[in-house]
Amino acid sequence: GRSGYQNLITFDMGGTSTDVCMVTEGKAQLTQEYSIDGLPIRIPLIDIHTIGAGGGSVIWVDDGGMLRIGPQSSGADPGPACYGRGGQLPTLTDAHLIRNTVRPEAFLGGRMEIFSDRSRAALQPVAERLGMSLEDAADSAIQLANANVVRAIQLISTERGFDPRDYVLVPFGGA
């Protein structure tokens, strides 16, 4: 491609999910094992692996007391609690705001006001259920999302015999 790189791992984190895909020697990896609503699709398609970890993915605790992220999403509207549009559920964006990895003054180039107090209020019940501080719960959610992304990249690379060190990561997306 125009970048001069032939081996890429694409990484698209949006509001609802993260998609990863490998491009080897300038060609996207293909699959013929795909289904939509349980119906098999038997034509060559670009092999995109999707996980439920986007900026709007909801952070929650399951019945066994384990921290989870997604697949439920707050969507763009109402969006994360920090948007101030009525969203009540804690999201990955809220966790990043609590941990200062998202700067309110720089969000959308400073064109959108976000509210850390709403993020904190939304994540507090999760922290209490886990018996953690708010900051530790936010850190744990971020670490879980990162681990899920790493696992997705492993599924498309090392588990298929490719070394991700031979590839350039190309991140893009809205989150």
What are these regions (language model features)?
Residues 1-175:
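N-terminally biased helix-coil "hinge/interface" segments that flank
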